[in-house]
Amino acid sequence: DIKIGVDNAAKELLDLNINVQQIFFDQYNETSFIQSINTILIQSPDGVLLAPVFKEQTIILTKELRIKNIPFVFIDSDISELNALSYFGMHSFKSGYLAAKLLLKDEKNNSDIAIFQAYRTGNSESNQTELRINGFKKYISDYYPDTVIHSVKIYAHDTDKNDKILKDFFNHYPQIKKGVTFNSRAYLIADYLTTNYIDDIKLIGYDLLEKNVIALKKNKICYLLAQR
C-alpha cells in the first residue's frame, strides 16, 4: 500500500525536520484531482510525489512546478515526456501487453473480449488506464487481429447500476468468455459473476486489493497484475 510506505518514510524523515503531507483525491473524479493540484500549488512544497491519473491536468501542474523549481516524482503511472525526476511503478503499456498475453494464453482462435472500464467524472480518461489499454490492444493486433473488443462502462461505487449493466451486456453478448479490467475494480465483475453463478468467464484484473485477492482465491479472477 502506497500510503503505508509514505507513512513509514515520513516517520524516518522526522529527525531531519522533513514534513510529509499527503493529499488525497478520488481517482474517478477529475474535479477532485484538480482540487488536489490547487492545494499543491498553494502550499508550494519543496518536492511533489504524484500519481498522474489525469494527463492534461498533470501537464498543467508540472508546468507550474517547473516555474517554481519544485522537483516532482511520479508513482503508479508515468508520463515520459514530462521528464519527472524519477518514476516508481510498473510499465503500464507492457503490463497491458502482458494482460492480453495471459488472457489469450492457449487460445487458438480469435474470440470476443470485454474490457470493463469505470466511469470517471470529467473529460479525461486515466493516464494509466489508457497506457494499459494501448498495450493490451497492441498484443491483440499482433497475434489475434480478428478479435472483437467490447468496451463496457461500469460504476466504481454503484452495485445496483452495475448489475443491470452487466446483465444486459452478457445477455446481449453470450459468446464472451474473456474479460479484463485495467483498474482495481475487478472484484466488482467477480462479485457479479459469483452472484449469478457464472463460472465460465476468464477475468484478469489489477492491484492486490483484499476483495480482488479473495476473488482470485475463489477462481473468479484468473490473474491479478500488481507492482507491489
Task: Give the ranges of each region predicted by the language model.
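Short helix-capping segments at alpha-helix termini
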Residues: 12-16, 67-68, 140-147, 194-200
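Amphipathic helical "hinge" segments at domain boundaries
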Residues: 1-34
